[in-house]
Amino acid sequence: MPIRRLPPELINRIAAGEVVERPASAVKELVENALDAGATKIEVQADGGGLTRILVADDGCGLSAEELPVAVERHATSKLNPGEDGEYDLLRIGTLGFRGEALPSIGSVARLSIASRARKADGSQAEAHAIFVEGGAVGAVSPAAFPGPHGARVEVRDLFYATPARLKFMKSERAEALAITEELKRQAMAHEAVSFALDVDGRRTLRLPAEAAGPDGRLARLSAIMGREFSDNALAIDHEREGVRLSGFAGLPTFNRGNAAHQYLFVNGRPVRDRLLQGALRAAYADFLARDRHPLAALYVELDPSQVDVNVHPAKAEVRFRDPGLVRGLIVGGLRHALAAAGHRASTTVSMAALGGFRPQSMPPPQPSAAGFSAWRQGGWTPSPAAAAAQILPGLSEVSARAEPEALDAYAAGGMAEAASPAPVFDPVDYPLGAARAQVHETYIVAQTRDGVVIVDQHAAHERLVYERMKAEMAEGGVARQALLLPEVVELDPAEAERVVARADELAALGLVVEAFGPGAVLVREVPALLGETDAAGLVRDIADDLSENGQALALKERLEEVCGTMACHGSVRAGRRLTAPEMNALLRQMEATPHSGQCNHGRPTYVELKLADIERLFGRR
């Protein structure tokens, strides 16, 4: 079969399949063009899930009549400029787009129209022009009406009409519209100073006014998109290391979800889905969340464009870092520092969920019987104090039966009569978790604070305390090692074996002693005693994978921490153990002094705080 040159129309359609996978991809490309043009206001309209019509209007710098026909040519762009030596450097890209493929790709599979008015340097208003592209055929430039002083309006109709086979792979109109909404939200998170609006089938579904540039404006934008609960339970992140800066907001461990859909990652203002960044985020929360729970976060990585390659994915959804270990370490370290600074703080949703469990209920009128009442009254009957208490709080009747009958009768008769022995007056102390007042079901500690009540799960709280103490001891004293009776030889790829041996000193500090054993093999002499009977070969292979991918021996650290977590769970105060008042208060004080004590190792809250105002609302006092 002879080799043939493909016609330009077919080449553009092939490129369109890589760049424009669905309507949301077209919206992404057009919105990025608007942002690169300096737009401060972007409006998007989508009909029929974006397949019937897409309109993206902006107030950017616009296009002149001379630029319009060039803009729809493949590989024509204003975003790449040659250096002093005349060479183009793809590793110094400061814009969102750079390939010049979006408009010609869309025009090859749809009916595309661009109307634009360029911004003039002297401030005067230029004439507006338009150009049409249909199935790859480019029309002539003509004068057009344009509502604004400058900017562009790009309209896409009948997307994929020229490639009907692609339509078979589209989802429902509603699903495609949701994908467009999510894409616009991601772009809006990265550019809080730009206002965004979205109309779906003629109905305004998203409106995000411009916010002030900076952390406060960014948090306001995130709150508008991710919900007020996120901003109430978010930790501010701002760390820098060797020219790489990490900023943004991450949720408290107790504020988590069952999937990773609420994790947003950005590199130099570009939304990305990167395995390295997602893995670093997961590793930072490894001490706080179970494997099936995921944190909420919006993280922004900023670094020199020469240190990251954005030209590794057709849709620019993935990036590659020159020093992935540096970026990963910055994310893990920055997040853990913020989590440690949070101390024993737990998410507000924990107390809200607890309050939601309380529902005012009307008691049905009890039926009179031969027992359980003291006297008849007009219009009804008066139960005995013990019976009334049993109706309100089951189990209290036993306590009431042991009380002095005279005191109960006096209470029932007088209602407001003073008790024989007044309750002790609480003198508030400046302890965040208050002073212990009782233990309930030998599992929960009830403490009184200055402005409310704290309920502590004694097992979950002590589990976190033991775990943090074990980690600190391991960091200070090193990891104890145990020698293998028979040293084990582990076969590896020669490059992997070389990487493992090169990190032998680091591994020895973690309790794993290895040495070279010929080409493509390492000899394991000692393993961490904490791991007990472990699969040394599997451990070394996991470490080799980590060194290859991240440049760090993460598998060993994570296994050690996992074992510490298991030991802490078994070595902590169990539910069902009765504690004395000094023991309960000691536990509260340790929680206040220990980082991450607001949640156990599995992400469950260790305590719930109920404010006095909330309790008063439950009883109709507010």
From Swiss-Prot:
CDD domains to which the protein is assigned, alphabetical: HATPase_MutL-MLH-PMS-like (cd16926), MutL_Trans (cd00782)
Pfam families: DNA_mis_repair (PF01119), HATPase_c_3 (PF13589), MutL_C (PF08676)
Gene Ontology MF term list: ATP binding; ATP hydrolysis activity; ATP-dependent DNA damage sensor activity; mismatched DNA binding
SMART domains cross-referenced by the UniProt entry: DNA_mis_repair (SM01340), MutL_C (SM00853)
Keywords: DNA damage, DNA repair
Classification via InterPro entries: DNA_mismatch_repair_CS, DNA_mismatch_repair_MutL, DNA_mismatch_S5_2-like, HATPase_C_sf, MutL/Mlh/PMS, MutL/Mlh/Pms-like, MutL_C, MutL_C_dimsub
GO biological process, one term: mismatch repair
Protein name: DNA mismatch repair protein MutL
Organism listed in the record: Phenylobacterium zucineum (strain HLK1)
Gene name tied to this protein: mutL
